[in-house]
């Protein structure tokens, strides 16, 4: 409450007001071009940061985020911290003046577009703060409404649904072909509705949120219907060339967004100096040393659909053993034995100097020749990034139906099992009856999973969560998922990497030659060939045991824990 009061005592702390005279309704908003130019800035909200560097229990960097450190490290600045409202003011400004345009079709179109972005804006605020003040009019510096308290979550969600339904009803189905993945259309609006209704429904269910108005089933039903409309009536499909060993990787590494799967994407362009940092982030030692965690790798099924964590001896398998015969998406998400970069023939091992866990990410990594051969430098990627893609819609549909208790095998066959088909796992479909008859112990355990999942659909809900983690890994969903599932305890779990049995030579590329040599303290440092990393156990590389175990790079980092009473929302 104190933080809110402080924010409300300053006009620019709340709505970041600018003089109203800067935009004159007599001079602007008269043509469709005016509306388009003014609304272009709204697109900057879609990706406020790179999705591939979000940290969680499944993906970490050398320096842990405040959320991962927990305790007093998770602080909110006196101003900012997400409590910024400038973009909302711009949206409400356009809505206040849009009728000055004489083109009625343009008025409807840009009203719909702006209401899409207002729903998007408030979704981000609700996720972060819970209750927030709702503003749908342009405010001046003297307006008393600046000082009103937060509105209820129920009111804000109701208004968001009104906005997104207007957008769905009035946005075009598809823009001109050249810009279709980069402009908001009615399918993107449906994708947003499915996303925020799934979030709200599961948040209310698992947090046992009792509010006046609609219960969690109302939102889950809306999510399922919105996703179902895209599935049944939309023009989208999963990208596939019939090469399951590379299609998933190539989808994200491609320069241009695939219009079949990407419903909405962000355009990057080397000639315009609009870049992101996927290559530098994963290939340069000073860019964070990201890595998937052992928990994430454990989630990938065997290629035949059986669970890796049901295999004998899975806890202490070598890297060569644990990556064999797995879901093909694993080898398209991290470097595994036999890995070569796109367009190259040299086999490369995971490079422990650039990954904190040993599981080196390759998703979104472009070929070395991209960006004029400069792509491996800091901030030089130009491959387009997804905001909404069809795969997420399929997962949202399956999860909403499962949580509602209305899921059928047919629903799985038009959603989750299409993802497995694309991955080449045609004979490893998710079977609802089998999953519910034998819920996965690993995903049920307090130490590694979600012990609060229960009911007759427990098994299939766990498997849908597995599929979501695998398919959407490194796309910025995980922390939000943990929040809505009330699974913050996952943040507290130990962060492990690949397993090493002790001192010795380790082949990580599968070519029969050592890539890493470990030796014990007090013994002579081994001689090594070019490119071979030599690490002293306990000094250069930390393991869970004194001389063997999982990579445990954060072993000496003090983590203060996730506070269940505080950390699901910011103040």
Predicted segments, located by residue:
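Short coil/linker segments at helix-helix boundaries
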Residues: 131-153, 203-221
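An aromatic- and glycine-enriched ligand-binding surface/loop that stacks and positions planar moieties
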Residues: 12-68, 157, 165-168, 183-190, ...
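Short coil/turn linking the two alpha-helices of tandem helical-hairpin repeats
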Residues: 126-133, 175, 196-208, 403-406
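A long, glycine-enriched binding/interface module in the latter
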Residues: 166, 182-185, 189, 409-570
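C-terminal motif of bacterial Sec signal peptides marking the signal peptidase cleavage site
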Residues: 8-10
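Conserved, well-structured interaction surfaces
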Residues: 24, 32-40, 44-48, 64-130, ...
